[in-house]
Each structure stands twice: as structure tokens, then as C-alpha cells.
Amino acid sequence: MEYIAGIEKAFKDYIGSDSINKLREKITDKPMILIAGDQLTGKSTQAKNLAEYYRGTFYSVGNLFREVAAKRGITVAEQAKLLLTERGIDVEIDYKTCEMISGNSIDTNIGVIEGRQPAYMGSFMQELGKRNLVRIYFQCSIREQALRFLRREIGEVAYQKGLANVPDIDYS
């Protein structure tokens, strides 16, 4: 798998030549549920529900992205723009995601990680020896994503207007 080799090279180039061995050393047998999908598909909500149900630890790659931006003293939007020219940010977040997937930093018996691409990092960690991974991919219609956006970002009134006025069309 070419992308596995690409991830390994990026980690060695940006994190350090011993970064892969450090990840291997952190791997535990703790099961991890990796939830991926598009924006506004319910990843965070369901990941939190699963973590609560199994009395596990919840991680959000989006929160990690926000923490990295705050640490750099920039907004999330500014950091997102930097991703176009600065590969190191993405690699740092991917590496931290792999550290989460290792299971080393959780006190509970299971972890739940949600984000746009944790399954890719899970495949990489599996190549390094991590086992007990479950991958779930969330999708929903464009209409549902738009309605979720209205509710989350604008409020219930906008959501109700959207519900009444946005046509239910299959765009696939």
C-alpha cells in the first residue's frame, strides 16, 4: 500500500527518524473504535455515545486540530489555509492521532476516536502491529448535512425553516 509508505516517510521527515519505533513501543492491546466520515454526519455525537456506553475514552481529531491552532496562536481558519503550504501541521496531527490509536494514553479499556480520517491512520497502525481496531464510516445526505449545519451554526429556527423549505432530492 503506497499510502502506508507515504505516511511512514512523512513521519520520519517531520517528526523524526525514530518516530515509527516510538509508535510501535506505545501500541497496546486496548480496542479502539475509529469513526470517520464527512463533516456534519454525526461522528462526534455517536463517538461520544459509544465512549459513554462502553465507559471508554473519547478523542476528537477536530479538537486536536483546534488545540494545535491555539498553541500556534492562530485561528482554525488560518491554520486550515496553512495546510495548503505547510505539510508539517497535517503530519503532526496525523502522528498524534496514531499515538491516540496506540491506546497508550488512555486509562480506560477502550478508546473511541472520531475525525475525518482516523481509519487511514488505523490502517497504518495496524501495519505497525496494532490490533483490535474497529472502523466505522459515517455518511448522510447533502440535505441532512445542510440541516445539521443550520441547527448547529444558526439555531433551531433556521433548522425548522430549512426542514420546511429544503427539498429532499437525491444528489448521488
Label for each model-derived stretch:
Residues M1-P31:
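Extreme N-terminal, non-catalytic leader segments
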Residues Y3, V61-E127, R143, G155-E156, ...:
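ATP-dependent small-molecule kinase phosphotransfer cores
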Residues I35:
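Hydrophobic anchor at the beta1->P-loop junction of P-loop NTPases
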Residues D38:
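P-loop (Walker A) phosphate-binding loop of NTP-binding proteins
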Residues T41:
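ATP-binding Walker
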Residues S44:
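Walker A/P-loop
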Residues R131-S172:
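A glycine- and Lys/Arg-enriched "phosphate-lid" helix/loop adjacent to the NTP-binding pocket
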